[in-house]
């Protein structure tokens, strides 16, 4: 049985992830890898090397990629998966997870999150603090739902999109890949073109 977790990324997001891992009480030891050589300890946990050193620990640890940038997180996680490393999901004990919910590998579900029945969440997603996903949502791989965001029922968010803090998505709305939705924005109809969207209701600004 593997009792060690290695978290790639020791900055802010990594610290939150480490706190979740501790509260899950699944691993006896937790350590970080980070390419910033100036970081030696984070959350009282040792930084034991750089990202490339993950392969040294392939057979003795589970892995989690705690990088906030969606594209970089995808690149690193897919590299680990391709090389056969065991990437896990992390779910805070305070999260409320409904029946028939799927959470993909490498996804973090933070404190206070509510995920309702029959929702599907892909690989490498961030479901951030106190966000809510209602019934029958589909979040594709490497999506980030920021703190306090609210998704109504039957919402679909395509790969790699990011919903800003406090954003709201109405029911039955589809958001295409490559979108950034700004803080406090309200999405009331489908977004079909990649870009940055802000406002109430949202408008495209680039």
What are the residue ranges of the model-derived segments?
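Short amphipathic alpha-helical segments
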Residues: 18-20, 75-79, 121-122, 192-193
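Glycine-rich adenosine-cofactor-binding loop
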Residues: 3-21
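Phosphate-bearing ligand-interacting subdomains
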Residues: 38-96
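Residues at the starts of beta-strands that form the adenosine-phosphate
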Residues: 4, 28-30, 62, 86-87
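Short phosphate-engaging motifs
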Residues: 13, 72, 187
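NAD(P)-binding Rossmann-fold cofactor-contacting core
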Residues: 24-41
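Structural signal for interior beta-strand "rungs" in well-ordered beta-sheet cores
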Residues: 89-205
């Amino acid at each position: 049985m593997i009792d060690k977790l290695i978290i790639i990324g020791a900055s802010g997001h990594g610290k939150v992830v480490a706190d979740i891992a501790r509260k899950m009480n699944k691993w006896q030891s937790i350590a970080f890898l980070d390419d910033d050589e100036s970081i030696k300890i984070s959350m009282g946990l040792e930084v034991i090397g750089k990202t490339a050193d993950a392969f040294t620990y392939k057979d003795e640890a589970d892995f989690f990629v705690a990088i906030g940038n969606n594209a970089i997180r995808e690149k690193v996680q897919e590299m680990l998966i391709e090389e056969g490393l065991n990437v896990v999901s992390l779910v805070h004990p305070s999260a409320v997870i409904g029946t028939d919910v799927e959470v993909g590998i490498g996804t973090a579900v933070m404190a206070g999150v509510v995920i309702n029945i029959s929702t599907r969440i892909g690989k490498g997603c961030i479901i951030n603090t106190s966000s809510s996903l209602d019934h029958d949502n589909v979040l594709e791989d490497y999506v980030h739902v920021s703190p306090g965001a609210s998704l109504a029922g039957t919402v679909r968010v395509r790969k790699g999109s990011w919903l800003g803090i406090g954003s709201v998505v109405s029911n039955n709305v589809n958001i295409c890949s490559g979108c950034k939705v700004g803080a406090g924005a309200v999405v009331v109809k489908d977004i079909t073109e990649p870009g940055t969207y802000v406002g109430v209701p949202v408008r495209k600004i680039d």
